Amino acid sequence: MLVKADMTKDIAQVMAEVGRKAKAAAAPLSIATSEQKNKALNAAADAILEARADILEANRLDLANAEKNGMAASFVDRLTLNEARIDAIAEGIRAIATLPDPVGEVIAEWDRPNGLHIERVRTPLGVIGVIYESRPNVTADAGALCLKAGNAVILRGGSDSAHSSAAIYKALVKGLEAANLPADAIQIVPVTDRAAVGEMLKGLGGAIDVIVPRGGKSLVARVQSEARVPVFAHLEGICHLYIDKSADLDMARRIALDAKMRRTGICGAAETLLVDRAVASTHLAPILGDLAAGGCEIRGSAEVLALYPAAKPATEEDWSTEYLDAIISVALVDGISGAIDHINRYSSHHTEAIVAEDAQTVARFFNEIDSAILLHNASTQFADGGEFGMGAEIGIATGKMHARGPVGVEQLTSFKYRVRGSGQVRG
């Protein structure tokens, strides 16, 4: 149960105990069999479906608070659970259960001239701290992915989704118990006080091995600034879609509409549309017309306004804004070179897409843009661990160390070397 504060212990004591329990659970979990972990995951999926009514009721409490606090529509969308989304959460957990177990996988092996046989083998990271905001589904995704990779996890969701996350967490614990795995392998921070985040960022006395923040720019900035343990950083998704002069117009229209409007509140939603100046007179109006008809606000450069007067003027700030809403900024560029320059200047290095038929243009896009995910002739909304066949993701890392792109079960492991000899000494 979540409480505002514990009157008998201060926050540091509460969190130290959480860390101690996680560390103790990590050891047996690291050697759990694939069968045990999969049994726990499938049992957790069953428990989520069985608790559907309780989860929806908990979510209604969170939604009522969000409405009371005047939260934005995009925030409410991320917070909302319904029958279909609960089904998807359970299906996502089952999909994770079907994935190959990464723990113990031999990544590489070789023999040395002296007869030593060396293997590089995947191992769990240990204890992972996940700090997130309004997405209650992250409770399930993060818990399930960490379990599959043999890691204990400490979950700290935002107070806005506290009731929903707590209801989902109960189902995850039932899964652990069904497989005779330590119940403390998945823990939810039992207090809503923000000081708990600060304690996690300090590492809980060496208990936490890595922090994964999943939320807005201010959350990620705080984590990166204060963390004393490694961080898988997930910055905002300032995602670009570039329509090249070689693009098929019908394809471009379908992709642009989906990339922006399928779900506007996710990090893979396109925030900026770039159109090759060479085809602006034929391609711009149909694409923007589709977006406007779908309820999207268009913010354009002066050139865009001249061709599409219904647009609003874009400011310099628009090019570096993650809207997470039905708003898109639009500019014309001088072909692929102009697109590359614009993207590399304003991108958060999350996801970019190109619609083009010219192979050399696509090759330049792939080679010269430094973002975690690059797509050709596909919507930016495929920037998702589930769509990558990972079952789910704990986030999309935009940094370059250890994990980049969707963080799935493989990215939640480290490795060690096993060296087998027959009496060799260096002498």
From Swiss-Prot:
It catalyses: L-glutamate 5-semialdehyde + phosphate + NADP(+) = L-glutamyl 5-phosphate + NADPH + H(+). It holds the Pfam family Aldedh. GO terms for cellular component: cytoplasm. GO terms for molecular function: glutamate-5-semialdehyde dehydrogenase activity; NADP binding. Its EC number is 1.2.1.41. Pathway: Amino-acid biosynthesis; L-proline biosynthesis; L-glutamate 5-semialdehyde from L-glutamate: step 2/2. The keyword Oxidoreductase applies. One of its GO terms (biological process) is L-proline biosynthetic process. Keywords: Amino-acid biosynthesis, Cytoplasm, NADP, Oxidoreductase, Proline biosynthesis. The keyword Nucleus does not apply. It is found in: Cytoplasm. Catalyzes the NADPH-dependent reduction of L-glutamate 5-phosphate into L-glutamate 5-semialdehyde and phosphate. The product spontaneously undergoes cyclization to form 1-pyrroline-5-carboxylate. Belongs to the gamma-glutamyl phosphate reductase family. PANTHER family: DELTA-1-PYRROLINE-5-CARBOXYLATE SYNTHASE (PTHR11063:SF8), GLUTAMATE SEMIALDEHYDE DEHYDROGENASE (PTHR11063). This is Gamma-glutamyl phosphate reductase. It comes from Brucella melitensis biotype 2 (strain ATCC 23457). The gene is proA.
